[in-house]
Amino acid sequence: MRVLFAGTPAVALPSLEALLAAGFDVVGVLTRPDAPIGRKRVLAPSPVAARAEELGLPIIRANRLDTEVQEQIALLRPEVAAIVAYGALVPPAALTIPDYGWINLHFSLLPAWRGAAPVQHAVINGDDVTGAVTFQLEAGLDTGPVFGTVTEFIRRDDTGSALLTRLSHSGSVLLTQTLSAVAAGTATAIEQTGPVSLAPKLTIEDGRIDFSVPALAVSRRIRGVTEEPGAWTVLAGQRFKVAAATLRPDRRELAPGQLAQAGKSLLVGTGSHAIELLAVQPAGKKMMDAADWLRGVGMVDGMVFGE
């Protein structure tokens, strides 16, 4: 089966590799254009583009599927398009180019968490279970009928990044199975049912920590936005990032945002009880263990996050 693969970030790579390993004829890759990365903002290809270059696959780089891009896709004569985190909408006119349309691998149990950041929202919301589905892409936002599902329990220490990595691998197997069924003529898609929730793309502001809410909600926020867009607060007027924390229900005397030292541990108060920060990044520094930051800063008495 001739497959156009549409994807951009590293999370899409397991699916590309799985399709190739299963013997699908990947006739081309659709990905976002090169983008600036790092502090020096050097232009670099997307992870999918970089891998496609290594494999010698034709690459279409586009932020939007205008008429010219649609013509490029049509020239590849794909029977189906597999899409995994491409990062842009597919217009109705492009949906009919492949014989079997576009089949999307989405990292939630639809119709829960439709949108660009389903895994992060699931962690922030405190969901116990999530998963991935393959579905037929249509004009609506993640509304198409579902071919298959895999489920994944959300662990108490899961970050959005770690959970997404696991789902990218289990989802790649599901995508391969779905396309195999489509090729064999045995695939069945079922309309979505159940409560709908939305998962819009997270902004930098979504990473701001509100220490006035209960500790569990603070922990979920930190885990959900790690690694993207990242959790942060303000200390002495400068941004202060947090990458890992754990609950400390034994310490309830701290006011929200108030810092305290307990041995080598860095504690901060919330709306219920303290949390212990494990990895932090002060302004202008690299990410470090909170204990190392404590040794460098000395006393934290009187310090309050958010000021």
Swiss-Prot record:
Belongs to the Fmt family. This is Methionyl-tRNA formyltransferase. The gene is fmt. Keywords: Protein biosynthesis, Transferase. The keyword Transferase applies. Gene3D superfamilies: 3.40.50.12230. Its EC number is 2.1.2.9. Attaches a formyl group to the free amino group of methionyl-tRNA(fMet). The formyl group appears to play a dual role in the initiator identity of N-formylmethionyl-tRNA by promoting its recognition by IF2 and preventing the misappropriation of this tRNA by the elongation apparatus. One of its GO terms (molecular function) is methionyl-tRNA formyltransferase activity. (6S)-5,6,7,8-tetrahydrofolate binds at S108, L109, L110, P111. GO terms for cellular component: cytosol. Pfam families: Formyl_trans_C, Formyl_trans_N. It catalyses: L-methionyl-tRNA(fMet) + (6R)-10-formyltetrahydrofolate = N-formyl-L-methionyl-tRNA(fMet) + (6S)-5,6,7,8-tetrahydrofolate + H(+).
